[in-house]
């Protein structure tokens, strides 16, 4: 006998839903635009004390508003706003976590039902066709640039950190593309 039949029904529904593919997961190149965002870091302080705005890209990793970007896109900001292709106004975001060593940051916007990208789980090897998605050159125009993986793991020096084990590729990355996803033909 069940003490709480409502709870039992909810549990059954949840386990059935886990077997179904989430409709918010992007599964093709045409829909990647719905998971990629333009990020504005507000109130950055430069070496002379002036305030400036930093701009970069990012992408949803869950339907409940979590976004991955590069740490250098949001580092030192006093506030972060996210622009999408499906809203007219910027959405305020909060910084959840950062890693200077990996040049990664996680930010979050309120809401749910966002389209998002799944992680690529297959082998990465030289010659793999890839695409860099984002909003380059501080514009509001989304771009998708193609290339191939040229080296599976590379180390590099940047002006903001030493970065280890990144994917070396031939897709053009312009200022503003930072933080955007590198994806395959299935949007992963």
What are the roles of these predicted feature ranges?
Residues 24-27, 56, 118-119, 168, ...:
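A structural connector/turn signal
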Residues 24-27, 31, 119, 126, ...:
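Extracytoplasmic/secreted proteins, especially bacterial periplasmic and envelope-associated proteins
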Residues 61-63, 184-185:
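A cytosolic small-molecule/anion-sensing beta-strand core signal
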Residues 18, 22, 32, 51-54, ...:
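Solvent-exposed, acidic/flexible segments
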Residues 36, 44-45, 62-142:
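Conserved active-site neighborhood of the chymotrypsin/trypsin-like protease fold
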Residues 2-60, 66, 70, 79, ...:
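N-terminal activation segment of mature serine protease catalytic domains
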Residues 54-58, 65, 97, 127, ...:
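Glycine-centered flexibility sites
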Residues 32-51, 90, 108-116, 142-188:
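Active-site region of chymotrypsin-like
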